[in-house]
Amino acid sequence: MGILYMEIKLKNDKESVNVLNECIELQLKKSQDYQNPNSNIKQAMHYRRGVDTIHDMIHQKLLRAQSLLEADGDPNFESLEDTYKDIINYCSFAVSYMRGKMEGQCSDRDMFNKPKVKKL
């Protein structure tokens, strides 16, 4: 987590904003694992079909949440709260990809990672 993030971190009484701050922290920590400086892998490379792949990931997380809600006991690994935080972060990835601003995204491809059609 960078110093700039710490300086601009919002302080307020709304728990929902606190959750968003936790999601930011989680996203930054996970990105250090998945897109570390020693790797050639960029974030956009995880989503071969662009936003469609991100939608698949969100759907997978929603199914996991449903499964956890229907279970009788506590989960062994990822909690329901963790799952919802992941959904929030995947939604931010979708918006980033739609804007064409995800790290490693090709500017000549659309939000589905298909070559852009040139207009005549």
Range-by-range predicted roles:
Residues M1-L120:
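Intrinsically disordered, low-complexity regulatory regions
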